[in-house]
Swiss-Prot record:
It is an enzyme of class 3 (hydrolase). This is Ufm1-specific protease 1. Its main location: cytoplasm. One of its GO terms (cellular component) is cytosol. GO terms for molecular function: cysteine-type peptidase activity; deUFMylase activity. InterPro entries: UfSP1/2_DUB_cat. Transmembrane segments: none annotated. It comes from Homo sapiens (Human). GO terms for biological process: protein maturation; protein ufmylation; proteolysis. Keywords: Cytoplasm, Hydrolase, Protease, Thiol protease, Ubl conjugation pathway.
Length: 218
């Protein structure tokens, strides 16, 4: 069963006041725990977020690698030691950026957010990314090791700021985007509540690769 597409569509903005709001361009598929029949609960969130990134911007499963293919690629390119294949070892944004290049997906640009800083200092970068046609942004940390994807940003007055979070930790077979929205698997979250100030974070910001740009022109 193909994953659901663009599951954030229909969500209301998080703030009613004057805001600057930017969402990702293009389309994506929502990959989550067990969506292909493999029980990866407890270790697969980084792989699932990577798969969502690979499905952008067409929102199609073609070209999206399975978990075994990701592990094989990382081992073959020397990023992981022999025996990584078939393991339950996690991956993060650095591995995701390597795999995006390896599998011919969108371009991935890494950004490091030091411990204790939080994402407030990255709001302008994220806003410019989404407003400029960027795709989903993978986020992962150390104290907060739960990988997730960001699909948009909303900056209000003062310190009010929200990010649109897509959580890959869902287990089951969702019937509709509204089901996921109601349960909070995709939704707007206040930045200070969504991210642990005691964790560093890596971001992997996706944009069209040169090959994808050429296909768009064609």
């Amino acid at each position: 069963m193909e994953p659901l597409r663009d599951v954030h569509v229909g969500l209301s903005p998080p703030s009613r006041g004057p805001v600057r709001l930017a969402l990702l361009s293009g389309h994506y598929l929502y990959y989550h725990y067990g969506c292909d029949g493999l029980d990866d609960r407890g270790w697969g969130c980084g792989y699932r977020t990577l798969q969502t990134l690979c499905s952008w911007p067409e929102g199609q499963p073609a070209g999206v690698p399975g978990l075994a293919a990701v592990q094989a690629a990382l081992e073959d390119m020397g990023d992981k030691p022999p025996g990584f294949r078939g393991s339950r070892d996690w991956i993060g944004c650095v591995e995701a950026s390597l795999c995006l290049a390896h599998f011919g997906g969108p371009q991935g640009r890494l950004c490091h957010v030091p411990r204790g800083v939080g994402l407030h200092g990255e709001l302008e970068r994220l806003y410019s990314h989404f407003a400029g046609g960027g795709g989903p942004v993978m986020v992962g940390g150390d104290a907060d090791a739960r990988s997730k994807a960001l699909l948009g940003v909303c900056v209000g007055s003062g310190t009010e700021a929200y990010v649109l979070v897509l959580d890959p930790h869902y287990w089951g077979t969702p019937k509709s985007p509204s089901e996921l929205q109601a349960a909070g698997w995709v939704g707007w979250q206040e930045v200070s509540a969504a991210f642990d100030p005691n964790s560093f974070y890596n971001l992997c910001l996706t944009s069209l690769s040169s090959q994808q740009q050429q296909r768009t022109l064609d």
